Amino acid sequence: MGMLVDEGKIKWEDRVIDYLPEYQLYDPTTTRELRILDLFLHNSGVGNADYLWTFMDIPAKEMLDRMRLVKPSYSLRSSFIYQNLFYVAAGEVIEKVSGKPWEAFIQEKIFTPLGMNRTAPKRKYIKDNNQVVPHYEVNKKIKPITYTQDHAIGSAGSVWSSAEDMAKWMICMLDSSKYAGGRLLKPATWAKMFKPATLVPDAEFYPTQQLTHPNWTTYALGWFQQDYKGKKINFHTGSLAGLTAIHAQLPDYKLGIYVFGNFDHAEVRHALMYKAFDWFALDGTTDWNKDFLNLYSKIFAKVEKGEKDFEAKRVMNTSPSLPLADYTGKYSDPLYGEFEITLKDNTLLIDLNHFEKAMLEHWHYNTFRGPYEKDWYGKATANFILDATGKVSKIDFEGMELTK
């Protein structure tokens, strides 16, 4: 986007609806006032809507169309909440202004000039058979899993790269976007990318703050920021199921680090980041590996305890209000799509938008619970809601309510 700003084709202060007039949000004021800059700052007030690509396979334009149904968590620019789909919207703006799909634009403007020959904007464009395999821990065992579909999320996080190519990108960013043949951005535009723009509250920052104790945490154009040992650091993680990454900078020392992992939420990435800063610039003997292992072990233990507490609240010896066949059928919602429930071998099966499935066994009363087909998703919980006549009228599936 900064390149288009430098070319005079767009301004950071321009309204999004002037480029995407069909892009409507739940709050008309936010729709009217949302600026290009806001797309990168997670300050719109619109809550997380990742279910639009984790529970369905729909084109980017349809995902954005459904955003009009996502209720805001707060008013525009009044706080911070992470929202991937605004980066999808930014990709659509880039296509509208440049006349090229986002993936073609970054290939031409970034990957090719930097010689990033083993980098692809989406996995389907990878020509190399030597590809990472994602892994997940399921039932205390680590197993390979299938790739997350990335064709719709595009500009929100679908770039695939190699260690060598990421080094080229990192060096370019540390050197004010310069490369052998010129520079990607004008100096002022490059500087704007790293200028703090939004305060990040503790609840929205990484748990690492419990160990590094930053005095401030901010967000710039695609970068989390904090102070560490009196110095500003810029960094960002990346995660798809079974895959992790982190890219960080210590600008005062022209030091950068990147970590790729083929295991879901391999938080050693944070330990390596701070250890690299200590080793190569800021000194320090902190055993970040031990400290982060202890921190995240407690976090994971808390999650596990929550699951056990949920299991313990099950009311035994209850029965569903209706015959299982009465729970079958199609349930729909303009935002969440269509779920279909069928009955097989006395067990309910749910199909989520023809994208994912789960087995639902009776839990208690009119609540059913069971494993997803992709077992690394864990277990699904569905509560059926009856109307005044005693018939099933709705389903509440993991907080998503659909009508029969």
What residue ranges belong to the model's regions?
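Second-shell loop/turn segments in exported
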Residues: Q24-D27, A49-T54, S75-S79, E92-K96, ...
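Active-site helix/loop module of the DD-peptidase/beta-lactamase fold
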Residues: M3-G47, R68-K71, E92, K96-P134, ...
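The feature captures the short pre-catalytic strand/loop hairpin that immediately precedes
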Residues: K61-S73, E137-H151, D227
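Catalytic loop of the DD-peptidase/beta-lactamase superfamily, centered on the K-T-G motif
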Residues: E95-P101, Q107-E108, T112, P144-K404
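Mid-domain, small-residue-enriched loop/turn segments at the edges of structured enzyme/sensor domains
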Residues: R35, L85-F86
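Extracellular/periplasmic catalytic domains that process cell-envelope and extracellular macromolecules
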Residues: K11, D27-E33, Y74, I126-D128, ...
